[in-house]
């Protein structure tokens, strides 16, 4: 079968017929040689060649006959008389190949003409410029390294079905340059965060992913079982209590970038497993943590976007200016100036207003919890530019240090950008007796039906009894940070393999 009739007929076949045809080709190759060789050694990448030689003129480049060995996936292929062109794609970009019967043997050319889009090839040759000025490899030898048995998505339509993008991320990455760039940026963002922390003299650590007691946040855990020990274990909902144990042990600045797991609903902002950074610094407080969070985010934006003034969903976001700071009540009043102080301290009025804004009533009946629920319904979504909401109520902050000057409040903040939470931090509670009482209060809430309330962690109390220095701590959601800095609206677009219902 010649290359001329195969591209004309394959698109008319259904997928199963195409796969069968390609399997037949693979079987023919197997009869002649190793179908999956592993001895081709490339020495060049497409983007590096484009950067080094792309601006050199044809008359200057052609005489140099620069030798290259390059490999990648064949994305385009066409014949023009006795010559054939192909475009291959590697991790850095694309480059064109040129073959004719003067440069390669007829046997090699015949083999190439039977290959398909999606096949992975290795080519050796020299660089030249076409008459249109396109940097091209004049091929002297080319080999099939891996056969693609399934057809790629249409080159014009790409992979447009969202669910298929998430289920078959490998195809999405092949077909969509935007997706590849997103995950390259994600890696760069994480590296930027890590470099910043190291520059601040923090030590990167790893703490357990399976906990005997779920803790560090108010959320439902995933439960598993350890057969040898015959005990239940919980996938961590947060690393906080282990990291603070390390501060007790004298590791005064620690951070961890890793996964946490919460057995809760999925949405455009929530995936059951997600990546976050948590960091803790001895002899620090929530003021220092707010500045750290601000600097980390600003630095990451500059690293991947070249600026801290970005656009999200068509609207500007100012990450360059100092982040605004508001209390919960100040934020409520900013967007609802008609509310009075009397109303905002009336439990029954708050409950009615919370329901009116479509929020659920909190398990804890305290005024602070009700004010927070109202904030979430009437103000949170309006915080577009970065805003720290500070001084959270004690009843919803079981691990935060109580304020010395504001009764019933803690030295806690949450950072909101584009209407959603991005970070959470506080001056850590370091009084073991106070912490024990708060754990008991959480247990009472759990007994009363609050599934997300914390357990009593006796070992953490024991660690605190050795003395936890004054400490500040903070957690930043990496997935949401990537969404912000890549202008993407759903968390599934920034997680390589998001959780999906079974097919």
Swiss-Prot record:
Its main location: cytoplasm. GO terms for cellular component: cytosol. Transmembrane segments: none annotated. It is found in: Cytoplasm. Mg(2+) 2 binds at residue 421. It catalyses: tRNA(Lys) + L-lysine + ATP = L-lysyl-tRNA(Lys) + AMP + diphosphate. Its EC number is 6.1.1.6. One of its GO terms (molecular function) is lysine-tRNA ligase activity. InterPro entries: Aa-tRNA-synt_II (IPR004364), aa-tRNA-synth_II (IPR006195), aa-tRNA-synth_II/BPL/LPL (IPR045864), Lys-tRNA-ligase_II (IPR002313), Lys-tRNA-ligase_II_N (IPR044136), Lys-tRNA-synth_II_C (IPR018149), NA-bd_OB-fold (IPR012340), NA-bd_OB_tRNA (IPR004365). It is an enzyme of class 6 (ligase). Keywords: Aminoacyl-tRNA synthetase, ATP-binding, Cytoplasm, Ligase, Magnesium, Metal-binding, Nucleotide-binding, Protein biosynthesis. It comes from the Bacteria. GO terms for biological process: lysyl-tRNA aminoacylation. Binds 3 Mg(2+) ions per subunit. Its cofactor is Mg(2+). Pfam families: tRNA-synt_2 (PF00152), tRNA_anti-codon (PF01336). HAMAP family: Lys_tRNA_synth_class2. Homodimer. PANTHER family: LYSINE--TRNA LIGASE, CHLOROPLASTIC_MITOCHONDRIAL (PTHR42918:SF15), LYSYL-TRNA SYNTHETASE (PTHR42918). Belongs to the class-II aminoacyl-tRNA synthetase family. This is Lysine--tRNA ligase. It comes from Neisseria gonorrhoeae (strain NCCP11945). The gene is lysS.
